[in-house]
């Protein structure tokens, strides 16, 4: 949702992004009825951080527990290398947000580092360097703590004697991106650090680039549990919060996920678990373990189905060795903005359209990039708060075809990406005249924007920051 509200923003001091040659910008959302911020979840700009943080259902759940969200674009420091200034920049960012928002507790609020894919390694390292302040850790479609397979593909940070004992951490891996070598380091970490609290979810029926509503609900429950189990009943908001350290033996164990598994050990309290504890993960309690098992049950023993995209009446090619498996061309209508794509079911090779699938239609949704959905097959280019000056990302669009499955067929997904020609360097140059807005009196709910193009083209707007929404002009 590119129109989602972010009330405040600050620049990240001391850091220059190679994507913009400028300071990254951090955006803060706090629930509108929040009297006290009890935690802040921080994610930087890779892909699905933005998708999750602007998910309406997820925001509703965060409002219930008083969790704020910070999204930083461009992302920086995939390692959390304190020698490169990340720690100082992080602390200054929260000081600045406390000053401009009026929520002074942001200076000391517990943090949940969150990252996807190439940014999914830093959350563990953040926790190792900030154990007293880390409420929980989430590595989404990512990797294990201290892994040798980092999301960014290079060496990991060396922890020395640091640990994340007593801090709940969650690793999530999609079923359709499954790789045993990513899971094994998480199991090994539990053996190496028996006081650690490492949870795991196989995001069944999902891939690497997407985040379903049901997964957002799972994350929300994990965060709610972290607050329930770790925050003291009362504390001084103007001082660091003394978080409770968890004892893993007070939690539950559940067997790790296996592809095509027919029998599973029953989830149970830590000391009563009858399966192999070396092949199991930790969970807060019965509710969290049961939700994990239910996710696995929902997709078990169902028939697979496959998705593709049609553009100009042709099924787009599927490239199994590519990171994003389907690529489109930007083929806009005469306005230069509107384009069309259709999601279809295909055979297992993604070469022909198939009739073997669920009875309902798949849908296309935005993952990231300057795009807005008009209807099931129509989309339009719309720039947003990421800005116009990111040479890597401003022109990148990534979309998702998905279907949640039914009693017979599994949930399935397929991603697609392409670039738009940005910036345009051909044709007549245009100028936009955007008259300033005068003082607005209290009680006024809407203001008309009167920008015009000297070429007579329509002008579009987006909210960079602040509690406002755009409705045409």
Task: State where each predicted segment sits.
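Solvent-exposed beta-strand/loop surfaces, strongest in extracytoplasmic domains of secreted
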Residues: 304-473
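Solvent-exposed loop/turn segments at secondary-structure junctions
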Residues: 46-50, 69, 74-80, 117-121, ...
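Alpha/beta-hydrolase active-site loop
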Residues: 80-106, 111-113, 125
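The feature captures the conserved acid-bearing segment of alpha/beta-hydrolase catalytic domains
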Residues: 135-220
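A domain-start/cap signature at the N-terminus of enzymes
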Residues: 2-40, 111-126, 130, 134, ...
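Loop/turn elements at helix/coil->beta-strand transitions in domains of secreted/extracellular proteins
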Residues: 35-40, 65-70, 107-110, 131-137, ...
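Alpha/beta-hydrolase-fold serine-hydrolase catalytic core, especially in secreted/extracellular enzymes
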Residues: 196, 204-338
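Active-site machinery of serine-nucleophile hydrolases
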Residues: 40-41, 46-95
């Amino acid at each position: 949702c590119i129109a989602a509200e972010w009330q405040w923003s600050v620049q990240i001091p001391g850091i220059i992004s190679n994507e913009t040659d400028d300071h990254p910008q951090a955006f803060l959302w706090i629930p509108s009825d929040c009297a006290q911020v009890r935690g802040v979840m921080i994610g930087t700009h890779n892909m699905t951080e933005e998708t999750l943080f602007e998910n309406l259902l997820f925001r509703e759940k965060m409002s219930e527990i008083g969790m704020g969200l910070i999204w930083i674009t461009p992302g920086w420091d995939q390692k959390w290398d304190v020698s490169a200034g990340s720690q100082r920049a992080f602390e200054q960012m929260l000081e600045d947000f406390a000053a401009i928002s009026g929520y002074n507790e942001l200076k000391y609020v517990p943090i949940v580092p969150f990252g996807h894919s190439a940014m999914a390694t830093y959350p563990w390292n953040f926790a190792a360097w900030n154990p007293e302040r880390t409420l929980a850790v989430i590595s989404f479609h990512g990797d294990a703590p201290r892994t040798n397979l980092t999301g960014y593909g290079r060496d990991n940070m060396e922890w020395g004697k640091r640990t994340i004992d007593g801090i709940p951490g969650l690793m999530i891996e999609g079923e359709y991106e499954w790789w045993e070598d990513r899971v094994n380091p998480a199991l090994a970490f539990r053996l190496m650090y028996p006081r650690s609290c490492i949870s795991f979810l196989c995001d069944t029926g999902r891939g690497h680039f997407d985040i379903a509503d049901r997964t957002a609900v799972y994350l929300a429950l994990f965060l709610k549990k972290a607050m329930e189990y770790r925050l003291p009943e009362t504390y001084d908001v103007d001082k660091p919060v003394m978080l409770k350290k968890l004892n893993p033996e007070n939690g539950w164990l559940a067997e790790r996920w296996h592809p095509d598994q027919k029998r599973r050990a029953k989830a149970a309290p830590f000391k009563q678990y009858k399966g192999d504890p070396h092949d199991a993960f930790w969970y807060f309690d019965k509710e969290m373990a049961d939700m994990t098992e239910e996710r696995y049950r929902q997709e078990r023993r169902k028939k697979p189905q496959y998705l593709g995209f049609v553009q100009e009446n042709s099924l787009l090619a599927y490239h199994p060795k590519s990171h994003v498996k389907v690529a489109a061309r930007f083929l806009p209508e005469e306005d230069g903005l509107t384009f069309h794509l259709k999601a279809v079911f295909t055979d297992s090779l993604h070469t022909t359209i198939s009739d073997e699938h669920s009875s309902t239609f798949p849908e296309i949704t935005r993952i990231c990039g300057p795009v807005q959905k008009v209807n099931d097959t129509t989309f339009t280019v719309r720039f947003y708060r990421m800005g116009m000056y990111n040479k890597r990302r401003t022109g990148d669009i990534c979309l998702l075809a998905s279907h949640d499955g039914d009693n017979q067929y599994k949930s399935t997904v397929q991603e697609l990406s392409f670039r738009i020609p940005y910036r345009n360097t051909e044709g007549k140059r245009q100028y936009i005249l955007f008259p300033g807005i005068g003082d607005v009196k209290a009680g006024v709910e809407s203001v008309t924007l009167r920008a015009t193009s000297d070429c007579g083209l329509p002008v579009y707007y987006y909210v960079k920051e602040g509690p406002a929404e755009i409705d045409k002009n």
